Amino acid sequence: MSSTFINGLSCISAQPSFSGDFPMQFCENSKEAVLFAMEPPYKDYIPPAAIRRMSKSVKMGMVAASVALEQAHLTPQAIFVGTGMGCLQDSEKFLKTLLDNQEQHLTPTAFIQSTHNTVAGQIAINLQCKGMNLTYVNGACSFESALLEVKMHMEQGQLQHILVGGIDEHSPHTTYLYELAGIIKDKAMLPCPIMQPNSNGIRLGEGATFFALSDTYSEQTVAELLNVEIRYHLTPNEVEAFVSDFLSQNGLYLADIDLVVSGRGENQEDKPYFDAFDSLFPSTPILIYKHLMGEFFTASASGVYVACSACNYSELPAILQAYPERRPQHPIRYVLLYNQYLGKEHSLVLLRKK
């Protein structure tokens, strides 16, 4: 059975993660309910004529994918992408034109570019990758679904080099609807303590994170992907069994985990689940990232980026620590990531530092 190694990674987020300055320049913007991605200089990676025709998510995805592949020095045989909402800006643009023109004289460009698989398709065209190209739209575990697909193909020996990523973007009208529905946290409730949130709602984020995966260990390898597990619905009381069973399948115990990366955010409704998860690791360092990057359907991809970067960092960054007093008891080897949203779409990702 083949192994799966992460040999390249790139993250565009609300933090300067793309610059590679992890985590020196990270800072919390605690007073904003909507966090925008810090976009890279696209013209350094995409021809200017093409940039004008691309939506934000396509541009972010193209650049993040290019950098991850460049780091890994590989050409992918397949491309798998997870997204919760796809190219929202083009979707809204097409619908607005549809209404403004009374369904007459419409150009198909915005519609074609609004489909969820646009990012994966554009990356494939740019790379001339004619292999498997899949986009997963599974809510808060969209990225994990793509990651699970990668793992299965690697284990079966069908593919050796795969590009996988998660991407989501803001759009004005959808953000407005989120605010009306109370999904986005009221600015009057900010700043909100992440460990003891006192109100419902999220701080909405966006971003693109890509990983170049291979079945071969190399000098560029940052971690090994051991396993991925997805469970649609759990109660807080079932979190312990979910985690313990997952680790047992991989021949591990709770005490074997050296570092935990939690998808804890500032939504009061999510607190019981993450409290139950944290209680399983009373002395293990736990990192959090959504207070910096925001909550969105594929935010967990940013969590994998944080995990890979942090476990290769000389000291765990204080700005990411849920419990600053905790220190690794021994060199970091096994890293466990947990994410969920509103009690649904729970996921676990297990990494091993190389």
Put a short name on every predicted segment.
Residues 140-142:
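Catalytic nucleophile serine of serine hydrolases
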Residues 161-167:
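Short, well-structured beta-strand segments enriched in hydrophobic/aromatic residues
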Residues 133-137:
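Short catalytic-loop micro-motif centered on adjacent basic/acidic residues
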Residues 1-132, 144-148, 152-156, 167-354:
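Conserved "HGTGT" condensation-loop signature of ketosynthase/thiolase-family condensing enzymes
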